[in-house]
Structures are given as C-alpha cells and as structure tokens.
Amino acid sequence: MELPILPTSVIGSYPKPRWLLRMYRLRDLGKIPEEDFKEAVKDASVSVLREHERAGVDIPWDGEMWRTEMTEHFTAKIGGFKFYGPVRVWGNAYFNKAAAVDKLEYKEPLVLEEFLWVKKNTTREVVKIPITGPYTIAEWSFNEYYPDKESFIMDLAKIINKELKMLENHGALYIQLDEPAMLNHPDEVPLAVEAINKAVKGIKIKVGLHVCYSNYYLLADYFDEIRVTQFALEFANRQFRDMDFLKKLSNKELGFGVVDVHNPRIESVEEIVKAIKKVFEYVEPELLYINPDCGMKLLDRNIAYNKLVNMVKATELVRKELEREGKKTTEFRTLKDI
C-alpha cells in the first residue's frame, strides 16, 4: 500500500463535544438508559471522525469518544482489577485508579467495538487505533496481588497481545501503543521494552509506539530493540530543540509532533513547515509521518481542529516541494518490513 508522502495522523484523544460530556455525567448518575448513552457515543465518534477527515488528516481516529480515560477504559474491562474511587492527579483533575486484586484475565474485547464502528464509518483506507501499553497501565494502577511489578506487567502484556491479535483478525491495519510512563524509571526501561515486545509478538500489521514528555535519549538506546514500525514523539512542546537522538533511529519511522497540545496558541502554517524541514536533517521524508505532539483532549475543540488544519496545510506545502524532487508517495510499512 502507498500513502502520500508525509502521511498526517493524530495521536489519540480529542476534545469531546459538550453534549457528550453531559451524557457521560447523566450515565454516571444513572439518569439515562445505557442504549441512549451508547447512541450518543456513536454519534460523537462519527462527528469527530468527520472533523479529522474535514481537516484533511490522512490517518484519522475518532478521538477516543468511547473512553473516559486512557487507563480506566482498559482496567474496567480486564478481569482482576477493582476500583476504590477517584484519585487526584493534579489541581482538580481526578481519575479512577484501579487496583489489581486478583490474577488479571482477558474477559472481553478492549477496543474492538469502537474500531469496527470507526472502520465502518470512515472515508479513509487506514485508521490508527491507540491502545494504552502494558507498562503504563501497571504504572498508573495499584498492585495488590502480584509479588512484583514484572509479573504484573507481563500479564498485562499477554492481555494486550490477545487484543492486538483480535484487532488484526478483524481487519486492523495500524495500532499504536501508548506508553507515556515507560521512561519514568530509567532502571525499568528494559522491563517496559520486554513488555512491549511481548504485547506485539506474532503481530504482522503496522505498530507505532507513542512516548511523550520524557528523556528521548534514554528511549533512543532501545530504538532497534523495540519491535515497532514507528515512534510517535512530541517535539513542538520542546520547541524542536535537541533532536540529535534521532540519529539512532535507523530504519524505523518517526511520527513527528508538530503542534503543542498544551498550548492554546494555534501554530502558523509557516512555523510548522519550518519544523518539518528541520527534521529532514535527521529523518528521510519516506520515513516521516506528521502528527500532533500528543492527545488533544485538553484543548478547546475549535482550537484543536484549527491546529490540525494548519498541520495538514503545512504538510501539503512541503509535499509540493518533495514532489518536484520525484518524491510523491511512501510505502505503508508493517512489522513484516522491519
């Protein structure tokens, strides 16, 4: 499969419509039937999917409309977890942090329903399915059952592997493991790498790895060892500084973060063009994808949309220059190709 050179994509989350947030609150209060809530989620999914497509994104997603939070969604579906109540993250932000109280088991599909819905409703050939990785799920949960962190993480890796195989069997082409916590403890990075490789064992489709707001020099030491096709990383937030670690990227792809999801300022087309050209010093255009730094759910929806619009406009300008050099398309690479 061939894609336009510099394919554009998203990382995962996107601002939920206000009416969907109200439906979440009503559902939590038990004031609406589950079927009404599910209908609202599906409507929001299509709405955001169309928004991404209207912005011109080549490889969209539905902004995780089905998910409350990136770990809670998964721990609620995996057997062996228990919720005690909300935990404060920062300021007035809380999330339901789960505890492993029994051996974890794969009880039901984790994201299959949302993937099939997006696949049915998209106008694009490829969508990217974000899935929180085993290390981050463990790091952001309590362990009240396993004798050590390693056995906890490896059981999660086995469960994620089952989900990935199910998605592949149902036609998924591109999965992204989200591991924002994998560099939190430098001495545990080898454990995180082992868990990722276990999670993707036997998978043949395209797999990306998203890591953000971390020491990428630490990650770069494992570029070759981690069995993924692409590393989706944030650069706009760090103002595109200190990118020498990319020299170790070898034949892996880079998902290049060009808009800051923690700053409401909408980046100009010109500055995004400049950033893309700068990364050409390290990565060949054929190995480069363009995306936001991270999930966009904390932004105002209109701001998020216009950031995507400018991201796509900038990419199209750079494409025109590359086309004059005879570079028009890029191969859609999978794990079979690395």
Curated annotation (Swiss-Prot):
Annotated keywords: Amino-acid biosynthesis, Metal-binding, Methionine biosynthesis, Methyltransferase, Transferase, Zinc
Cofactor: Zn(2+)
A biological process term (GO) from this entry: methylation
Known EC number: 2.1.1.-
Record has Transferase as a keyword: yes
Keyword Ribosomal protein belongs to the record: no
GO MF assignments: 5-methyltetrahydropteroyltriglutamate-homocysteine S-methyltransferase activity; zinc ion binding
InterPro entries: Met_Synth_C/arc, MetE_arc, UROD/MetE-like_sf
Coiled-coil positions: none
Residues reported to bind Zn(2+): 210, 212, 234, 294
Pathway named in the protein's UniProt entry: Amino-acid biosynthesis; L-methionine biosynthesis via de novo pathway
Cofactor: how bound: Binds 1 zinc ion per subunit.
Source taxon at top rank: Archaea
Role: Catalyzes the transfer of a methyl group to L-homocysteine resulting in methionine formation. The physiological methyl donor is unknown.
NCBIfam families: PRK04326.1
Family: Belongs to the archaeal MetE family.
Name used for this protein in its record: Methionine synthase
Species, as recorded: Pyrococcus horikoshii (strain ATCC 700860 / DSM 12428 / JCM 9974 / NBRC 100139 / OT-3)
